[in-house]
């Protein structure tokens, strides 16, 4: 989510670090900062763009002259609002250790309380600051450890994901780095080394890199680097020679950001669940709503307001909450909610969903709900945006920056958050502990199942060839898969400019069936659930009118093959998690149809990423 760049060599560090941060801007961020060593530690950090940091550097950068070692960071907030004090790097109390961190420290709260009990003072609201104080404490208790040993011991206390760079004026000629679940790469130069979260800020300086693996750390000096495991076992690493352009590296080697973001979903799903889903305990921990959970459980009704793809996620949330928590749910387009004079009371909970947290219609719905006395909670991806500031409580999706205008990973992240919410609302009320445990186990298996679906990318592209010249398309689903049909149709419309409609499969005969002929592709979500037999009947109705059927079906279903032109298989799963699987082939199908038609999939015409006007 964030960007890391480090340098050690013989050149001025600050300009190199600043340029590296500019190369990392594509990742999305809310603040930036750097720390360098030139006898003592010097640090600058600023909320907002890298250009804000550059202005600060131009004014006070003389203090950084002569520094040839440094680290810098662009932050995407996960704990604590975007602000100067929450920006990285973070320093220990004495100002001789600085650290930058990507990832989430799951047990930071317990560690923070422990450190505060020993007199440590925290300057920020971040989870990352815990690490620098932990390293400081360990090193003070045993000075023989050195920086490397102190970092190693500190990481043994940490639960969660991290990619870190640490420097200290006590040992000014090295950078110590480590990773677990958050990528780091070392660039090998001549008498200099670069460390980064990806190759984008490195490639203009060297094409020789070493990628760290999970559970590894490295000590980097001007002349050498050593890689070891956290357990202190030395590793021999292969040097990779890059042949990518800068633009391609920014896209992770993918042709478009949208495809990159589709393929990021297994890891994003793990990030959303990390520290929240406790499978063996049969519970979820949702810190953002923990203090309000009893009030949420007492709601007479839940109303969900959203726009576009977030509205489709809200529909799935309706199914989940009603099935498991047995609380009535209504889902409104935010743009309609405010104009229909809705009946809302203090007994209601209104959930607003927005990737950006700035969607104008959703903000208007939020404010109306508050005026009418409802409890309002938010589901949002961008920390510090307007929705989390104006709602009583809420949950972040932790999907990371989404560059492509057509939402993919933000949608699946929202659905997972709603699934976790349904489990939290159900606990102790409507379903047993064992059932919650089974549901959470199903949810925890989803990332691996999505990875399996993504392996069919080439086969899905072949199917897209048959659809690229269509003028219209119909998407059908039932139950949990009806909102997925809506989302699949929206994706095709957004990026390929082919008219498409999503319908509940049974509603086909109430109008859309009149449109079906040999030129009409019909994409049917036909998974093995309690609506399977009915879906097969709907497919027969399409076939009898010469419609071209493409099915999304459960692995091992051979019966479906005789009824369809093409089948895309997904792994078996319970109905409640199926939307997280069935949407993936529809995202890929839309992407490939659009690219085959020569469309700009990352920036489709007439659309904006965040709709901030009504």
UniProtKB/Swiss-Prot annotation:
Keywords: Aminotransferase, Cytoplasm, Glutamine amidotransferase, Repeat, Transferase
GO molecular function terms listed in the Swiss-Prot or TrEMBL record: carbohydrate derivative binding; glutamine-fructose-6-phosphate transaminase (isomerizing) activity
A Pfam cross-reference name: SIS
Enzyme class: transferase
Domain of life: Bacteria
Record carries keyword Oxidoreductase: no
Domain (SIS) ranges: 292-431, 463-604
Active site: 2, 609
Keyword Cytoplasm among record annotations: yes
Subcellular localization, as worded in the UniProt entry: Cytoplasm
EC number(s) recorded for this UniProt protein: 2.6.1.16
CDD domains: GFAT (cd00714), SIS_GlmS_GlmD_1 (cd05008), SIS_GlmS_GlmD_2 (cd05009)
Reaction equation(s) it catalyzes: D-fructose 6-phosphate + L-glutamine = D-glucosamine 6-phosphate + L-glutamate
Gene Ontology cellular component terms for the protein in this record: cytosol
Domain Glutamine amidotransferase type-2 intervals: 2-223
GO term, biological process aspect, one: protein N-linked glycosylation
PANTHER family (alphabetical): GLUCOSAMINE--FRUCTOSE-6-PHOSPHATE AMINOTRANSFERASE, ISOMERIZING (PTHR10937), GLUTAMINE--FRUCTOSE-6-PHOSPHATE TRANSAMINASE (ISOMERIZING) (PTHR10937:SF0)
Task performed by this protein: Catalyzes the first step in hexosamine metabolism, converting fructose-6P into glucosamine-6P using glutamine as a nitrogen source.
Quaternary structure (record): Homodimer.
NCBIfam families linked: glmS, PRK00331.1
Name the UniProt record assigns to this protein: Glutamine--fructose-6-phosphate aminotransferase [isomerizing]
Lineage summary: Bacteria, Pseudomonadati, Chlorobiota, Chlorobiia, Chlorobiales
């Amino acid at each position: 989510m964030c960007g890391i760049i480090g340098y050690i060599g013989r050149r001025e560090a600050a300009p190199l670090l600043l340029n590296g941060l500019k190369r990392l801007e594509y990742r999305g961020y809310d603040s930036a900062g750097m720390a360098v060593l030139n006898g003592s530690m010097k640090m600058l950090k600023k909320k907002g763009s890298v250009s804000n940091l550059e202005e600060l550097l131009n004014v006070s950068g003389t203090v950084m002259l002569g520094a040839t070692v440094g680290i810098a960071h662009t932050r995407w907030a996960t704990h604590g609002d975007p602000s100067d004090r929450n920006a990285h790097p973070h320093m220990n109390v004495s100002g001789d250790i600085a650290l930058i961190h990507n990832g989430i420290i799951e047990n930071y709260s317990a560690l923070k309380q422990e450190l505060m009990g020993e007199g440590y003072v925290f300057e920020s609201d971040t989870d990352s600051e815990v690490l620098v104080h932990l390293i400081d404490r360990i090193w003070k208790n045993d000075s023989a450890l050195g920086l490397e040993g102190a970092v190693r011991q500190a990481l043994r206390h940490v639960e969660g994901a991290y990619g870190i760079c640490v420097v200290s004026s006590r040992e000014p000629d090295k950078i110590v780095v480590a990773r677990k679940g958050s990528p780091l790469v070392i660039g090998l130069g001549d008498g200099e080394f670069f460390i980064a979260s990806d190759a984008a800020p490195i490639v203009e300086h060297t094409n020789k890199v070493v990628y760290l693996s999970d559970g590894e750390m490295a000590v980097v000096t001007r002349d050498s680097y050593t890689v070891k495991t956290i357990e202190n076992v030395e590793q021999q690493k292969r040097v990779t020679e890059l042949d990518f352009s800068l633009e391609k590296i920014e896209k992770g080697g993918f042709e478009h950001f949208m495809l990159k973001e589709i393929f990021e979903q297994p890891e994003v799903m793990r990030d959303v669940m990390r520290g929240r889903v406790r499978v063996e305990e049969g519970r979820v921990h949702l810190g953002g709503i923990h203090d309000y959970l009893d009030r949420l459980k007492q709601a007479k009704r839940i109303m969900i307001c959203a726009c576009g793809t977030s509205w489709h996620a809200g529909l799935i949330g309706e199914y989940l909450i009603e099935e498991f928590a047995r609380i009535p749910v209504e889902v409104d387009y935010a743009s309609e909610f405010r104009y229909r004079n809705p009946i809302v009371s203090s007994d209601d909970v209104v959930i607003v969903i927005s990737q950006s947290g700035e969607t104008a219609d959703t903000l208007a719905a939020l404010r109306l709900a508050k005026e009418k006395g409802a409890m309002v909670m938010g589901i949002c991806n961008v920390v510090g945006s307007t929705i989390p500031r104006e709602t009583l409580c809420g949950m972040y999706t932790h999907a990371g920056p989404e560059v492509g205008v057509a939402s993919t990973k933000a949608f699946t992240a929202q659905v997972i958050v709603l699934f976790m919410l349904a489990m939290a609302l159900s606990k102790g009320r409507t379903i047993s502990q064992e059932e919650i445990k089974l549901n959470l186990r199903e949810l925890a298996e989803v990332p691996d199942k999505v990875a399996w679906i993504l392996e069919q990318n080439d086969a899905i592209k072949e199917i897209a060839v048959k659809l690229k010249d269509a003028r219209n398309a119909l998407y059908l689903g039932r139950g949990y898969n009806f909102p997925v049909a809506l989302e699949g149709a929206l994706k095709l419309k957004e990026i390929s400019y082919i008219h498409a409609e999503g319908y509940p499969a049974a509603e086909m005969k109430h109008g859309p069936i009149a449109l079906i002929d040999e030129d009409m592709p019909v994409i049917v979500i036909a998974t093995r659930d309690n609506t399977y037999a009915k879906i097969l009947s709907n497919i027969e109705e399409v076939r009898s009118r010469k419609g071209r059927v493409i099915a999304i079906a459960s692995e091992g279903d051979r019966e479906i093959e005789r009824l369809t032109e093409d089948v895309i298989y997904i792994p078996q799963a319970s109905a409640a998690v199926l939307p997280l699987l069935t949407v993936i082939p529809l995202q890929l199908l839309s992407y490939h149809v659009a690219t085959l038609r020569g469309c700009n999939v990352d920036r489709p015409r007439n659309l904006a990423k965040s709709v901030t006007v009504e």
